[in-house]
Structure formats: structure tokens, C-alpha cells
């Protein structure tokens, strides 16, 4: 992450269920902040991305949202100053379970406080203070990032003019919580996990992470997309083996290669904490109902985007979020995308 910047929050950083001392938040920026500092767009990521959302002169490698950020693109750097933070609790520069605890000089591991989406949103406010930004033009997020964007708008209403929520919701449904619970159990059942005490410089619970990632990827796409993309095609390197349980099909090969790539780049404990944070978030906690929770919002407009084939955050959740926002916000757009891509 050659273009990453790092903000150390000095002193005690209060969290909903604990605190950190001098945590670091990694972030990247694109474009130029104007003289009135009112053209800033803040991006919150999903569970797994880093802050490297797009290429830049400092880091020309493609980012995970390359098609969205840049000259003439939807997040136009000719007009906006774009900020993307790496979530607190992650492993791409921001303080998380894999980071050293300054009080012990050892990784936090499971001594890291319980993490909430609100904690991630609060950490972003320190980045804005550091950059001299009092009020955002827009806050944007997809999946977990959409939850974080909503939490930011609820916790920092005066700093947020516009909200864009993509494939997200005000709370996770039981089936999504159940799926993530199974992913976490798969990781924790890996003998190498060792109650979170694995060597962070070594291999870690690779088998558990690989299987959890495969399960996640299945939920990120729709059955229709799998069928259209892979059908029952055999894997390109398919050969008859002595066991009937090898990788015979192209879809199996796809899952295997992507899971292996993810496992080599993401820390297991960080995954556990961020996954749980998604489960814990509930917009109703800010008022008892969405109507009451949203009463504090000061948004000029909001856009809620959903995908009809999304399994994790069904389109009915996007509609419900848009309807609840419309009770408080005068300009709310709901966009239902007709796509086979599902959550991804």
C-alpha cells in the first residue's frame, strides 16, 4: 500500500466495549480538497478490502473500486476529494487483532476489544479532523461499509450531508448471522488457530480460513450466476484421480484458487472480529426503531442501492432501509439492480 497514509490517534480511543491506546488508522486519498473543504467523499469498505480503492501516481496498481474512482468516473476526482479508510480491526495498516499491543509488545490477538461498526465509524471521524474536514459531501459504503456509513450518519449527523448505501442494511438477518457464525466456527475449529494464539508471522489457520472463504464466496453470488458462468464444466486442469473427492469441476477450481489467494493476505483473528461486528450492528439500537433512530439524521439526500439476487442482504432490506430513510430525509432514491452477480 504505497499510497497509504497513517494517522495515530493519540491517547485513549474509547470503543463501545473497551478501548485502545494510540491506535493507527490507515487511509488513502484521491483528488484535491477544495478551499472550503466541502467536497470530501468518505468511503467505508466491506469486510475484507484495504484502503487501496483505486490507483494513484503514488501507487499505480489497480484498486478494488478502480472503475468507480478517478477522472470522469462516478466518484470524479476532478470534483471530489475521495477518502477511503481501512477499517479499525483490519490487517491492512489500521490497528487490529494482529497489531502489537503497546502495553505488551505482543499482538493483541483475542485481547483486542470487541469491535463494533460504530467503533469503525468513530475512528473515521479522527481522520476527518486530521484532514481539516468538518462536513462531508457524501459518505459511501457497500456491504459492511454500508452499515458503517449509516452508523457514521447516525453518530455524526452534522458531518454528513449525503449517504449512499450499497448492498447493505440497517441490521443483519438471522440467516446472514448464522452463515457468518458457521464461517467463524470453521476457523476456530482449525487446530492451528489455537484459541487465537497462532503465530501471526507464520501460516495461521489456513485450512479454516480457506473453507470459510469458500462458504462466503458461495453466498456472495447467486445460483443463476454460478450456473451461467460455470455450468457443469470440468476444471481446466481436471485429471482422473485416485479419489472421488478431488477438484473435478470448474466452479470448484474457482473457489479453490480464490480462497487460497485470500488466505494468504488476511489475518484470521481480524476476520473473526470484523465478521462479528457485522452481526452486532443494529440501526435500531440508536433509537428503538428505525424511525426513531433516523430522527437525528441531517441528510440532504440518500441513495440506497440493492441487487435482486443478493442472498446476504436481500432486496427487501434495501427497500425497507430506503422507506425508513424517506420518513426523515426529503430526497431518497431507491435503486434495484437487475443483476445475476448477487452480493458481490
Question: Where in the sequence are the language-model features?
Answer:
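Short beta-strand/loop motif that positions the catalytic acidic residue
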Residues: 304-306
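Catalytic-loop region of hydrolases
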Residues: 1-43, 57
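Catalytic histidine neighborhood in serine/cysteine hydrolases
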Residues: 322-339
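Conserved hydrolase catalytic core segment
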Residues: 135-178
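Short alpha-helix in the alpha/beta-hydrolase fold that links the catalytic acid
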Residues: 286-291, 301, 314-325
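N-terminal cap/lid subdomain of alpha/beta-hydrolase-fold enzymes
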Residues: 28, 36-101
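Conserved acidic catalytic loop of the alpha/beta-hydrolase fold
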Residues: 105-111, 118-138
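Alpha/beta-hydrolase-fold enzymes
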Residues: 165-261
Amino acid at each position: 500500500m504505497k499510497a497509504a497514509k497513517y494517522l495515530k490517534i493519540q491517547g485513549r480511543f474509547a470503543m463501545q466495549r473497551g478501548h485502545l491506546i494510540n491506535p493507527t488508522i490507515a487511509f488513502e486519498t484521491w483528488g484535491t480538497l477544495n478551499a472550503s473543504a466541502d467536497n470530501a467523499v468518505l468511503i467505508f469498505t466491506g469486510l475484507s478490502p484495504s484502503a487501496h480503492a483505486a490507483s494513484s501516481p503514488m501507487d499505480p496498481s489497480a484498486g478494488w473500486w478502480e472503475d468507480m474512482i478517478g477522472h470522469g468516473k462516478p466518484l470524479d476526482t476532478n470534483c471530489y476529494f475521495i477518502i477511503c479508510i481501512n477499517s479499525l480491526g483490519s490487517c491492512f495498516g489500521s490497528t487490529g487483532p494482529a497489531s502489537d499491543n503497546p502495553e505488551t509488545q505482543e499482538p493483541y490477538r483475542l485481547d483486542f476489544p470487541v469491535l463494533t461498526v460504530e467503533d469503525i465509524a468513530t475512528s473515521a471521524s479522527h481522520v476527518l479532523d486530521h484532514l481539516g474536514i468538518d462536513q462531508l459531501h457524501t459518505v459511501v459504503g457497500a456491504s459492511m461499509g454500508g452499515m458503517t456509513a449509516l452508523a457514521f450518519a447516525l453518530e455524526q449527523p452534522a458531518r454528513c450531508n449525503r449517504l449512499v448505501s450499497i448492498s447493505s442494511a440497517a441490521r443483519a438477518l438471522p440467516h446472514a448471522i448464522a452463515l457468518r457464525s458457521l464461517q467463524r466456527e470453521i476457523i476456530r475449529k482449525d487446530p492451528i488457530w489455537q484459541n487465537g494464539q497462532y503465530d501471526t508471522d507464520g501460516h495461521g489457520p489456513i485450512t479454516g480460513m480457506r473453507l470459510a472463504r469458500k462458504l462466503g464466496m458461495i453466498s456472495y453470488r447467486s445460483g443463476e450466476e454460478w450456473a451461467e458462468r460455470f455450468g457443469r464444466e470440468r476444471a481446466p486442469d481436471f485429471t482422473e484421480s485416485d479419489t472421488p473427492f478431488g477438484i473435478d469441476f470448474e466452479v470448484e477450481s474457482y473457489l479453490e484458487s480464490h480462497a487460497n489467494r485470500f488466505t494468504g493476505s488476511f489475518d484470521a483473528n481480524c476476520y473473526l472480529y470484523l465478521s462479528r461486528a457485522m452481526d452486532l450492528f443494529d440501526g435500531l439500537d440508536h433509537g428503538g426503531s428505525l424511525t426513531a433512530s433516523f430522527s437525528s439524521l441531517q441528510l440532504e439526500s440518500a441513495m440506497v442501492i440493492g441487487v435482486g439476487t443478493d442472498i446476504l442482504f436481500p432486496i427487501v432490506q434495501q427497500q425497507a432501509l430506503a422507506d425508513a430513510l424517506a420518513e426523515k430525509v426529503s430526497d431518497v432514491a431507491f435503486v434495484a439492480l437487475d443483476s445475476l452477480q448477487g452480493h458481490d
